[in-house]
Amino acid sequence: AYRFPGEINIIAIGPLTNIANVINKNPNIVKIIKSITIMGGSWFSGGNISPVAEANIYNDPEAAEIVFKSKIPITMIGLDVTHKVFLTASHIKYLASLKNNSGKFLQDISNFYVEFYKETKNMNGCYFHDATAAIAFTNPEYFDFKKGKVFVSQDRLTRGQTVVFESEKFHETFIDDKRGNINIANKVQSKKVINKFLEIAEKYMK
């Protein structure tokens, strides 16, 4: 990061442990990271590992709290949008039909999730969490965002819940905190996200 100050953009698609560790060891690094796009959290959509928590944040809420209050420019791509982007079994079958090994690989690694959603939710496909976050970075115009401050609960019953104070509704003094405002995705043009992924698959997976 120090070789390319202000040029590092991070797309985080798992728990934020490693990023929090770096911040703890070298707090000045927050000044040279350009942005972090986080696949994690939830505003109004509840949780997917508990009634209130999304899995990536739940697995290390202490780390998530460190990252969210770091003042690094952050975009949160949570369940409010990823649960609206659905990769169908037909999409996965199409990927497997592409004349390259990558398409078959994507089918193989998706089968577990397809079976899981079929058994637990009677759905024919799977949510498209991680790739949605990546596309939010490359094509933010597919999303609507609100600004707010995000706090992460570490209490037993609400562990991992992301509590959002929307900037337009809550004055900073009300929450008595100096953390930066975060861009929180609250709407998505899901068809455009899927089509962009398929376009990339067709073009680059060779």
Task: Tell what function each PLM region has.
Residues 1-84, 89:
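Active-site histidine-anchored catalytic micro-motif
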Residues 58, 77-206:
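Conformational coupling and interaction surfaces
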